[in-house]
Curated annotation (Swiss-Prot):
Residues 345-578 form the ABC transporter domain. It comes from Escherichia coli. The keyword Membrane applies. This is Microcin-J25 export ATP-binding/permease protein McjD. The chain crosses the membrane at residues 25-45, 66-86, 143-163, 167-187, 261-281, 286-306. ATP binds at G378, P379, S380, G381, S382, G383, K384, S385. Signal peptide: none annotated. Is able to protect a cell, which harbors the plasmid pTUC100 encoding microcin J25, against microcin J25. Is required for microcin J25 export out of the producing cells. It is a multi-pass membrane protein. CDD domains: ABCC_MRP_Like. Keywords: ATP-binding, Bacteriocin immunity, Bacteriocin transport, Cell inner membrane, Cell membrane, Membrane, Nucleotide-binding, Plasmid, Protein transport, Transmembrane, Transmembrane helix, Transport. The lineage of its organism: Bacteria, Pseudomonadati, Pseudomonadota, Gammaproteobacteria, Enterobacterales. One of its GO terms (cellular component) is plasma membrane. Homodimer.
Length: 580
């Protein structure tokens, strides 16, 4: 990973720590460092005690023995206490960082282009956050404890052993560090790559499971348990195979690290046994060396796996940050948004395609004026919904230009555009929360009186012959309400906004003709100066439009009043004859 990317990664993690988070993190580093030094000294103290008891030291005194015993007990107790305290600090830091990261991620999702939001399902999106959160936890935990502690212990061990003038043991410990670093540096890249591949497949499996749950009704209606089971089983098999490859290489690395430890630590062990037998090494020194071997062997052997885990987490987290980096570029705001609420819309030579093969819109030009209602109609796939999605800012990669009062749409920020244009679609976007919450989406400061007023305008003041309750809890996708009732929630949101342009993309299709006409009348009364664009095939809505545009294969093929088009346009006359 490049140095610049690493710095960006560490800056991102550091930015997730507030003052309390920084205090917790540096406290963890301090506790780990202090406890590691204390643990490293304990074998030396034990060696002194052993030599005193065995008579190897001539200056024996009970006071000195008691002092050493107290110091050794302090080392043991402080080690236990530091583990407990570290766990508390680590848990607090994780909660602290996870909260800030989740809110940051929510802002980043909110600021993403709508087309990007629709690429992945909720399962993939939420699991990405969980994985990134886990990556940060792995990095913080390993750096502050699992890597730092063995490194300090190894350095302290060499210093202590050198102080006893055991040059051979100190040299072997140093050689072990050198060989270990070279060996694991070469292998951790492969381990990290396999681990990242395994995590990516796990993420895809989770996304597939979420997709299956979302579409379970379709599977059930088609008796397709076998098909969806096979699909998910294939994903789990791929996940299993990827994990097997990772753990196989990880086991080999661990085995090689163990062999390295056995060879080098074993040579130190044998050297000191021979020293004791030859009378040149004291029993206490031998116990100190063996204590260091026991103390260091397991944590150091695990460093290889930990390094690969760290590299994988860094790579995965860097990708997450790159995908969800906040867009700090600010678009110029529209001066008239805070002054004039009347907007005219001009479209010039607008073309759009989802691929290079076929244009969905082909050089469309038209002028729409404030206070008027326009209807777009035409066969399925003619480009109606695509046109209004471009106007509302859903698609950015179009050719030509769109102007609001002579200001190009490209120069208008998403936030300002959302204030200027309200786009009602067939998608209800109902949250699993109360009716009150679902309506406050449109106006955070809306009072209960205002909410009840807009519910009445949307013909939703009564549900199941009872007055509606704002505390009604809506289930997944609002499915405890009918299709028409969910569309009325969307309409009620409209009445809580103050848009200059209103787009209705068949958003009243689940309502009957009477309710639809009443609501459209309420919209025109409530927003007398608004420019209204309506997509519909219903005659009653086309009749009350100031102008109807007929689209076919991405072109405007006819325009005018409905009565005139009944005579001159085959598609409109066909709609009228079907209705009759």
């Amino acid at each position: 990973m490049e140095r610049k990317q690493k710095n960006s990664l560490f800056n991102y993690i550091y930015s997730l720590m507030d003052v309390r988070g920084k205090f917790l993190f540096f406290s963890m580093l301090f506790i780990t460092s202090l406890s590691s030094i204390i643990i490293s000294i304990s074998p030396l103290i034990l060696a002194k005690i052993t030599d005193l008891l065995s008579g190897s030291l001539s200056n024996f005194s009970y006071e000195y023995l008691v002092l050493l015993a107290c110091l050794y007990m302090f080392c043991v107790i402080s080690n236990k206490a530091s583990v407990f305290l570290f766990m508390i600090l680590q848990s607090s830091l994780r909660i602290n960082m996870q909260k800030k990261m989740s809110l940051k991620y929510l802002r980043e999702l909110y600021n993403e282009n709508i087309t990007n939001l629709s690429k992945n399902n909720a399962g993939y999106t939420t699991q990405s956050l969980n994985q990134a959160s886990n990556d940060i936890y792995i990095l913080v935990r390993n750096v502050s404890q699992n890597i730092l502690s063995p490194v300090i212990q190894l350095i302290s061990t060499i210093v202590v052993v050198l102080s006893t003038k055991d040059w051979f043991s100190a040299g072997v410990f140093f050689l072990y560090i050198l060989v270990f670093v070279i060996f694991n540096t070469r292998l951790t890249g492969s381990l990290a790559s396999l681990r990242k591949h395994s995590m990516d497949i796990t993420l895809n499996s989770y996304s597939l499971l979420s997709d299956t749950v979302d579409n379970m009704i379709a599977a059930k209606k088609n008796n397709a348990l076998r098909l969806i089971s096979e699909r998910y089983e294939d994903a789990l098999t791929q996940e299993n195979n990827a994990q097997k490859k990772y753990w196989l290489l990880s086991s080999k690395v661990l085995l090689l690290n163990s062999l390295l430890a056995v060879i080098l630590f074993g040579s130190v062990f044998i050297y000191n046994i021979l020293g004791v037998l030859n009378g040149v090494v004291s029993i206490g020194h031998f116990i100190m060396i063996t204590s260091y071997i026991i103390l260091l062997s397991t944590p150091v052997e695990n460093i290889g796996a930990l390094l690969s885990e760290i590299r994988q987490s860094m790579s995965s987290l860097a990708g997450f940050i790159q995908r969800h980096a906040e867009n700090k570029a600010t678009s110029p705001s529209i001066p008239f948004l805070n002054m004039e609420r009347k907007l005219n819309l001009s479209i010039r030579e607008l073309s759009f395609s989802y691929s290079d093969d076929k244009k969905i819109l082909n050089s469309v030009s038209l002028d729409l004026f404030t206070g008027k209602m326009y209807s777009l109609t035409g066969p399925s796939g003619s480009g109606k919904s695509t046109l209004v999605k471009i106007i509302s800012g859903y698609y950015k990669n179009y050719f030509g230009d769109i102007y609001l009062n002579d200001i190009s749409l490209r120069n208008i920020s998403d936030e300002d555009l959302n204030d200027a244009i309200y786009y009602l679609t067939q998608d209800d976007y109902i949250f699993m929360d109360t009716l009150r919450f679902n309506l406050r989406l449109a106006n955070y400061d809306a009072s209960e009186n205002e909410i009840f007023k807009v519910l009445k305008l949307a013909n939703l003041s009564v549900v199941n012959n009872e007055p509606v309750s704002l505390d009604t809890h809506l289930i997944n996708r609002g499915n405890n309400y009918s299709g028409g009732q969910k569309q009325r929630i969307s309409l009620a949101r409209l009445f809580l906004r103050k848009p200059a342009i209103i787009i209705i993309d068949e958003a009243t299709s689940a309502l009957d003709y009477i309710n639809e006409s009443e609501i459209l009348s309420s919209i025109r009364t409530h927003f007398p100066d608004a420019l209204i664009i309506n997509i519909s095939h219903r005659i009653n809505l086309l009749e009350c439009s100031d102008c109807v545009y007929v689209l076919n294969e991405g072109n405007i093929v006819a325009s005018g009043h409905f009565r005139d088009l009944m005579v001159s346009n085959e598609y409109i006359s066909g709609l009228a004859s079907v209705t009759e």
